[in-house]
Each structure stands twice: as C-alpha cells, then as structure tokens.
A protein has these predicted regions:
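Hydrophobic transmembrane alpha-helices and their immediate junctions
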Residues: 16-21, 54, 60-63, 156-196
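Short, aromatic-rich membrane-interface segments at the entry and exit
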Residues: 18-21, 40-44, 60-66, 204-211
Length: 226
C-alpha cells in the first residue's frame, strides 16, 4: 500500500487525474489497516499522506532525515537487542508506563530473539528461502518468520545478501541524490523509508522491498520524461 501511494503521488506530475487515484488509495489503505488493527502500517500510511501535504521543502527534508534516523536506531537498539529490551528499565518505562504498550511488541521480541540465536550458526550464507515449517522447527512454535526484514535477509542469505541489498540501496540513493530538492523525489524517498519502518515489524517479499529502489534508481529517466 505504501509503495502504491508513493507511485501514485509520483504520477500526479504526469496527469492530475492520478490525484483522484491517490486519494482513493489513501482512504482505502487507512480504512482497511484500521479494520485489521495493523497500527505500524496504519501510522506510516497516515504519516506519508500528511508528509505529501507539507509545502515547506526544509521541513520535509528534516522530517525525512529524522524518520530515517529513527529507523536506524530502532533496528540497532531495539530489534538487534531481541528480548534484552525487556530487561531495560528505561525501555520498560517508556513503552509500558508512558505509551501503555506491550514491551514485546505483540511477541515480536520473541521472534527477533529466536532469529538472533540462529543467525550466528550460518552468518555468511544464511539458510536460503525456507518455508514456514522450518521457522517453527528451528526458531519458535509461534514463528512464521522473524517479523523483521533485515533479520529475514540475514536468515535467507546471511551477510552476503545483506551486503548485496545494501549495495542496491546505495546505487538507488546515489542516483536520486542530485534531485533531492524536488518535491517528488522527497516523497519517493520518504515512502521508501516508511516501507523500511513498516518492515521493522513485518516481512515483505523481496519484490516489494526492491520496487521503490528501482523507481529511485530510474528517477532521472522519469524526470527527463516529465
């Protein structure tokens, strides 16, 4: 849904009728995610929708950078900490007492912890594209994956696959960087960051995770046709 919105808002530059499709997609996404109770995805959809309405370039840039930093910090200090987060008094206070949320993020910390225990056993190559039964047998009886994209990458292809994905990200960012002042470019980059944040708590197919990077890489061609 987030990449559909990102693509829609990019196409508005070609034809204003795409704005109608964007609004319809945004409403459908918000309503459906609210009904199923997917709060992380719902929050990112709403945040991206509001972000596209901001007219100030500097503010959009600051929000983009801040959101990316939050993504990095959460991945390293929360996800990579696994169940260790439950022993952190500050984290317990912020999440349980202030936010009134479950410190396990609906048992996701159990899945992260299980993944972090098995990844070191095959850190270079990973375990390939395994099925649900493999997760249940090697990680947890409730696991159908680590519910985190980076951990899934490490499980599937180890450090090699993570480096490969990072290189693709680097090429995509480097390609769109000269156009960073464009509103459309900022919207596209922010939609990608929102997808990454959603992937902190979920697992998405590689095609979904690679799609916005492909658009970013080819942004210069898109810009030329506009």
């Amino acid at each position: 849904l987030i990449i559909a919105l990102g693509t829609n808002i990019l196409c508005v530059k070609y034809n204003k009728l795409w704005l109608v499709n964007y609004i319809a997609t945004a409403i459908s996404a918000i309503v459906s995610l609210f009904m199923v109770g997917s709060m992380t995805s719902l929050s990112m959809i709403i945040l991206f929708t509001l972000y596209t309405l901001i007219p100030f370039a500097k503010l959009k840039k600051n929000i983009l950078i801040t959101t990316f930093i939050i993504f990095i910090l959460f991945q390293f200090f929360v996800v990579f900490n696994g169940r260790g987060l439950e022993n952190n008094d500050l984290a317990r206070y912020l999440v349980e007492d202030v936010l009134h949320k479950d410190l396990t993020f609906t048992h996701r910390t159990y899945l992260w912890d299980a993944a972090l225990k098995i990844i070191p056993k095959s850190p270079i190559w990973g375990y390939g594209l395994v099925e649900g039964e493999w997760y249940k047998a090697h990680m947890s009886s409730i696991a159908m994956g680590p519910h985190n994209f980076i951990l899934a990458v490490l499980l599937n292809g180890g450090i090699i696959l993570l480096i490969f994905y990072s290189i693709i990200c680097g090429y995509s960012i480097n390609s769109i960087r000269p156009y960073f002042k464009d509103t459309e470019a900022k919207n596209l980059i922010f939609s990608t960051i929102c997808l990454w944040i959603m992937a902190l708590m979920e697992m998405y197919p590689y095609t979904i995770m690679l799609y916005p990077l492909a658009i970013m890489y080819n942004y210069q061609n898109i810009k030329a046709k506009q």
